[in-house]
Amino acid sequence: MIETAQAFGVDIGGSGIKAAPVDLTKGDFAEPRLKILTPEVSTPQAVAKIVKQQLDHFEVPESAPVGIAFPAPIKPGQKLDFMANLDQSWIGVDVTEVFSEACGRPVVVVNDADAAGLAEVQFGAAKGQDGLVIATTLGTGIGTALIYNGVLIPNTELGHIILSAKHLDAEKYASSAIRENEELGYKKWAKRLTKYYGLMEKYFNPDLFTVGGGVSRQSEK
C-alpha cells in the first residue's frame, strides 16, 4: 500500500512499462518496481490497460499523485502529433485523457526524458548545477532534456537529429536498442555515441551531460 509521502510513477517505453511507488523525499523506489512488456501492438487502449493493472497491483489509493513518463512530446491540452516508439495510432490522441479515463483518476503525463532530467536536477548528478544541463536517456531511443539554471526547456527531442551519412537520426544510429539489434560491441557503440555527444557539445556547449536510461544497468562497460 502506498503511503502519503509517496507518489506513483510509471515509465512507458518502447520495450517495457515500468511502475512503482516513489519516495518523494529521497527520489527512490519505495517498493520494487513492476515491469510489464510493452504490447507488440502498442495502441492507446493496450498500453493504458497495463498502466491500470500496475495501479491495481500496488493498491494505489485515490489520494496518491500519479505521474506517467511518456515517449513523445507532451503539450498540456493538446493532442499528440508525433510518435516514434509506440503504435502510430497514438497520433491525434489526448494522452492525459486516455490514461485518466483508463485509471479512473487524474494523472500527470510528461515527456519521459523531461521527467528523467527533472529527477537528475532534483536528486541526481545535476543537483545544484548552474548553467545548461543536457540529460540523456539511452534505451529504445535517445531521449533528451535541456535544463537551464534549474528550469526545464520541454520536449527537445534531440535524439532525432540527423547523425549519419545515411541520413539516419541519432536514435536509429546510436541508441541502446540499435547496439543490441546490430550486435555492436561496446567500443564500436561508444564511437557512435561519441559522435552524437560531440555534436551536442558543438551545438549547445552544455555545462554538464548526464547519461541514464536502460543503459545504466551496464554502466561499467
Report each predicted region and the residues it spans:
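Glycine-rich phosphate-binding loops at beta-strand->alpha-helix junctions
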Residues: 16, 200, 204-221
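Hydrophobic "anchor" residues
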Residues: 16, 28-29, 80, 152
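Glycine-rich phosphate-binding loop and adjoining helix at the ATP-binding site
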Residues: 32-34, 39-52, 56, 61-66, ...
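Short coil/turn motifs at secondary-structure junctions
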Residues: 24-26, 73
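Glycine/GP-enriched mid-protein hinge/lid loop-to-helix segment characteristic of carbohydrate kinases
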Residues: 1-8, 20-24, 31-34, 41-45, ...
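Asp-based phosphoryl-transfer active-site loop
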Residues: 10-15
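Glycine-rich beta-strand-to-loop/alpha-helix junction loops that act as flexible
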Residues: 66-72, 138-140, 207-215
